[in-house]
Amino acid sequence: MNIPSHGKYGWLPILYEITKDLNPKKIVEFGPGVGFTTVTIASAIKDLGGDVLVNSYDIWMDKYWGRKENSLKFFEEWGVSQYINLEHLDFYDWIKLPTEDRNFDILYFDIDNNSKKLLE
């Protein structure tokens, strides 16, 4: 298992194993930020020998997370770019897509949130 290591994300090995166990055919992720979780999921797909894409969406509004280009570079460094479809898309726009475009086997939802934001 070759995945990123980050103190804030000590559960990445669990995410990797869950992805491998489920062997998903369609993956949706919201809020990749830099890309630690995206790389972890894509690494599991790569190790499965799959041809599945992680459909990862973000809006990159926060200076803390950087730009889309930073995420793409991170994916390249980990050798998993071919397993990731990274797009600028807000969750509220995604939910308006046709149902067939919103199907998934795994949904990883990691947008910038807290209890106050979720209740608003």
Task: State the predicted function of each range.
Residues N2, H6-E120:
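S-adenosylmethionine/decaboxylated-SAM
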